[in-house]
């Protein structure tokens, strides 16, 4: 088990702790705040509810979390040390000195700083090349972007190792090759923030109206396509040059007060805080965090279905987890029902009753059928060559409830696999509890004629192998059932 040390257990430090812990790392936390354990516990509760459901594969077993009163004890032997202390350069440099006196020279020391350059953090350090900026975005346990900012002091080998570790956590390391104050993303956030302050101060818009302008329009566009690609599309068939020619004159118009900052007075603070309370004060912070996480999970899973943006990052992480998560024809115990799905129930799989909605049982069983098809050789290459299976009939029994975050698995028994016919019986479990069964009858088809036909000899052989191995299994209870006519 690999160990990470988290120095500073606030919102960001807690998010880092959750990201490492839920990806199988042991985590040691150092934070003198007597409330640190409670605060991190609340962040972890949110993370356990939301992060596992982003993946279509099971995450590794959760690591061990421990809290330490001694900084040296926390960092000794850690492979990754993440500093998330307050944004004071003198404090950070003091903390680095203490860390480097105790830590492994080969450990990566990442800073969550949103503003300082890595060269500033490396100044006077015992080992400057050990320190990099790894700037995350809240919630750290969900959002994949990490701005990895380096200097010539950092070796190429160390930089690649840092990237590899972050990718293993399901993150997207964006290597910022030239350091600058506030890196990349926070410079955009600061520009938008300054413009928003002016709009409120001048009475043009309220905090709620500004938020609506973002979340009802360009915020959604940016989330899926960014800034430049969005404008490229806006240019139509003529592309980016047309867009630039069309809107270039705007640069000389009074459309922004970007470099002109309103005076930061108590009156401005009270004005914005009051409007914000009126806008969102009916929700607690914890409620808002859960609303945020629900929305982020839904949006990122939608991007995942398109293999786009943050969704493509999630799919790559799933692909890395898959070989260890599900067996194939040669590694499965074919004498028993075969594991064809193992995952957590995502937030967007639940309904108004607070449990997994019926359409998602069908989706889960369909995914299990797809996995069984892969096991017998009907994979993407086979389908591209013109053969596949079509489902002719499905029957689902709902036997118990599943809730968001529940770790479920599906085990599949082949009742018939002969010629063009494939008859499967799926059982869905949470632990030892049987939640549902799904029965499917499929026909092998030619994608050219769209009519049933015999599968390849390789698929026939794989089905025969499974049929022989599972011959001793009893016929499942519930198989062949239908909804009975009411008495």
Curated annotation (Swiss-Prot):
In the N-terminal section; belongs to the 3-hydroxyacyl-CoA dehydrogenase family. L-carnitine dehydrogenase subfamily. In the C-terminal section; belongs to the betainyl-CoA thioesterase family. Its main location: cytoplasm. It catalyses: carnitine + NAD(+) = 3-dehydrocarnitine + NADH + H(+); N,N,N-trimethylglycyl-CoA + H2O = glycine betaine + CoA + H(+). Keywords: Cytoplasm, Hydrolase, Multifunctional enzyme, NAD, Oxidoreductase. Pathway: Amine and polyamine metabolism; carnitine metabolism. GO terms for cellular component: cytoplasm. This is L-carnitine dehydrogenase/betainyl-CoA thioesterase. Coiled coil: none annotated. It holds the Pfam family 3HCDH_N. The keyword NAD applies. It comes from the Bacteria. It is found in: Cytoplasm. Residues 328-487 are annotated as: Betainyl-CoA thioesterase. The keyword Transmembrane helix does not apply. One of its GO terms (biological process) is catabolic process. Multifunctional enzyme that catalyzes the NAD(+)-dependent oxidation of L-carnitine to 3-dehydrocarnitine and the cleavage of betainyl-CoA (N,N,N-trimethylglycyl-CoA) into glycine betaine and coenzyme A. Homodimer. NAD(+) binds at residues 8-13. GO terms for molecular function: carnitine 3-dehydrogenase activity; hydrolase activity; NAD+ binding. Transmembrane segments: none annotated.
């Amino acid at each position: 088990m690999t160990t990470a040390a988290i120095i500073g257990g606030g919102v960001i430090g807690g998010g880092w702790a959750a990201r490492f812990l839920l990806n199988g790392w042991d985590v040691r936390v150092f934070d003198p705040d007597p409330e640190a354990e409670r605060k991190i516990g609340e962040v972890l509760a949110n993370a356990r509810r939301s992060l596992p459901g982003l993946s279509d594969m099971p995450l590794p077993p959760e690591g061990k979390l421990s809290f330490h009163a001694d900084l040296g004890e926390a960092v000794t032997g850690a492979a990754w040390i993440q500093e998330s202390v307050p944004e004071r350069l003198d404090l950070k440099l003091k903390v680095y000195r203490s860390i480097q006196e105790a830590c492994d020279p080969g450990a990566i020391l990442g800073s969550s700083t949103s503003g300082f350059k890595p060269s500033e953090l490396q100044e006077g350090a015992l080992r400057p090349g050990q320190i990099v900026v790894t700037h995350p975005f809240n919630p750290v346990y969900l959002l994949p972007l990490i701005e990895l900012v380096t200097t010539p002091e950092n070796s190429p080998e160390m930089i690649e190792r840092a990237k590899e570790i972050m990718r293993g956590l399901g993150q997207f390391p964006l290597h910022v090759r030239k350091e600058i104050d506030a890196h990349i993303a926070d410079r955009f956030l600061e520009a938008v923030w300054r413009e928003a302050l002016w709009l409120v101060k001048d009475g043009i818009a309220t905090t709620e109206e500004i938020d609506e302008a973002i979340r009802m329009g360009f915020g959604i566009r940016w989330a899926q396509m960014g800034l430049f690609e969005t404008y490229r599309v806006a240019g139509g068939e003529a592309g980016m040059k047309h867009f630039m020619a069309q809107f270039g004159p705007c640069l000389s118009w009074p459309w922004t007060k970007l470099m002109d900052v309103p005076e930061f007075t108590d009156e401005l603070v009270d004005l914005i805080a009051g409007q914000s309370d009126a806008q969102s004060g009916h929700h607690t912070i914890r409620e808002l965090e859960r609303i945020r996480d629900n929305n982020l999970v839904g949006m990122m899973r939608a991007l995942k279905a398109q293999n786009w943006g943050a969704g493509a990052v999630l799919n790559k992480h799933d692909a890395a987890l898959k070989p260890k998560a599900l067996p194939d024809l040669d590694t499965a115990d074919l004498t028993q029902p075969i594991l064809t799905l193992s995952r957590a129930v995502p937030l967007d799989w639940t309904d108004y009753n607070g449990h997994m909605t019926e359409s998602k049982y069908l989706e889960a069983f369909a995914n299990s059928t797809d996995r069984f098809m892969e096991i017998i050789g009907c994979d993407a290459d086979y389908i591209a060559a013109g053969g596949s299976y079509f489902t002719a009939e499905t029957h689902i029994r709902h036997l118990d409830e599943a809730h968001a975050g529940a770790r479920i698995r599906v085990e599949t028994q082949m009742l018939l696999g002969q010629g063009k016919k494939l008859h499967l019986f799926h059982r869905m479990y949470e632990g030892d509890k049987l939640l549902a069964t799904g029965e499917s009858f499929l026909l092998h088809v030619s994608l050219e004629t769209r009519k049933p036909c015999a599968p390849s000899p390789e698929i026939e052989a794989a089905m025969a192998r499974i049929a022989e191995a599972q011959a001793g299994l009893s016929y499942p209870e519930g198989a062949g059932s239908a909804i009975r006519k009411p008495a």
